[in-house]
C-alpha cells in the first residue's frame, strides 16, 4: 500500500482522458531513487519521466519547467545515484549568486554567509539523499562541492556530475563560461 495524494489522482484522470491510461502504472511503479531515510522517489508526471530518461541517456541536459516541478531535486537524485554507482567521482552544484538584481555586497557577513542562502535549496536536496553526516563527510573530502557559479571560472571538471541551478538567472557570458567547464566523463544539467 502506498498513499496517493489528490494531485496524483487528478493527473491520472487527465492521462486517462487523453487516452494515456496505460502510462499511469508506469508512473506509479517506476522508482527513480531512495532518500537517505528510504522514501521512494517516483516521477509524478510524464514530464518528470522524460526528464529522468534524458538525465540517464545524455551528458548535457537542459531542464525547463515552472518552479516547483522537481528539476533540481531530481537532478540531485540522479547525481547522487551516479556517484554511488561510481559513474562519477564528484558532484558539483552551482548557481548564480545574484538573483533579481540583488548585490552580494549589501548582505552582512563574509562571502560564505552571503552565498549560503542562495545555495540552500541545493543543500536541502543533498541532505535528503545523503543525510547530514554523510553530506558533510563527502564535502570535507571534496567529493561534493556547492559553490557560486563565479567559482567555476578557469576550471576543467572531469568525472563530475555538475548541476547548474537557476540557470535562467545567468548572463550569456556566465552560461558560456559554465558550458566550457566540463571535461572528460562529466555530465551537466
Annotate each language-model stretch with its function:
Residues 41-57:
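Pre-Walker A adenine-sensing motif
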Residues 70:
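Conserved glycine(s) of the Walker
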Residues 89, 141-144, 158-161, 185-189:
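Loop/turn-to-beta-strand initiation segments
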Residues 73-141:
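Conserved P-loop
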Residues 166:
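Walker B catalytic acidic pair
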Residues 63-65:
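Hydrophobic anchor at the beta1->P-loop junction of P-loop NTPases
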Amino acid at each position: 500500500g502506498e498513499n496517493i495524494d489528490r494531485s496524483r489522482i487528478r493527473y491520472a484522470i487527465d492521462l486517462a482522458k487523453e487516452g494515456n491510461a496505460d502510462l499511469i502504472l508506469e508512473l506509479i511503479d517506476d522508482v527513480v531513487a531512495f532518500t537517505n531515510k528510504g522514501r521512494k522517489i517516483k516521477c509524478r508526471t510524464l514530464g518528470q519521466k522524460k526528464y529522468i530518461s534524458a538525465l540517464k541517456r545524455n551528458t548535457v541536459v537542459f531542464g525547463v519547467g515552472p518552479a516547483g516541478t522537481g528539476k533540481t531535486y531530481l537532478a540531485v537524485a540522479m547525481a547522487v545515484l551516479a556517484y554511488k554507482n561510481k559513474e562519477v567521482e564528484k558532484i558539483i552544484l552551482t548557481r548564480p549568486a545574484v538573483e533579481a538584481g540583488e548585490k552580494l555586497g549589501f548582505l552582512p557577513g563574509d562571502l560564505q554567509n552571503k552565498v549560503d542562502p542562495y545555495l540552500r535549496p541545493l543543500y536541502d536536496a543533498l541532505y535528503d539523499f545523503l543525510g547530514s553526516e554523510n553530506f558533510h563527510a563527502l564535502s570535507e573530502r571534496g567529493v561534493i562541492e556547492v559553490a557560486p557559479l563565479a567559482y567555476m571560472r578557469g576550471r576543467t571538471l572531469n568525472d563530475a556530475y555538475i548541476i547548474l541551478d537557476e540557470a535562467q538567472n545567468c548572463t550569456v557570458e556566465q552560461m558560456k563560461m559554465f558550458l566550457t567547464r566540463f571535461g572528460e566523463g562529466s555530465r551537466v544539467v
